[in-house]
Amino acid sequence: MAVPKRKMSRANTRARRAQWKATAPNLVKTIENGQVTYSLPHQAKVVTDSAGTALFLEYKGRKVADA
């Protein structure tokens, strides 16, 4: 394992750590039953009834799992 020869300065440490960024997910805007929902592409969506109770999960219009 590599061992640093000298102590790294605070500025260099922070400059190096600044490169570790989280990427924002690409959300897809869909309109269902008059409501705008944002979801991740290629993931199952929760189908709810009018009261907001989760019924099941669907993907590409098919039921894939119970809620």
Curated annotation (Swiss-Prot):
The keyword Ribosomal protein applies. Residues 1-20 are annotated as: Disordered. Residues 1-19 have a biased composition (Basic residues). GO terms for molecular function: structural constituent of ribosome. It comes from Paenarthrobacter aurescens (strain TC1). InterPro entries: Ribosomal_bL32, Ribosomal_zn-bd. The keyword Translocase does not apply. Keywords: Ribonucleoprotein, Ribosomal protein. GO terms for biological process: translation. This is Large ribosomal subunit protein bL32. NCBIfam families: rpmF_bact. Belongs to the bacterial ribosomal protein bL32 family. One of its GO terms (cellular component) is large ribosomal subunit.
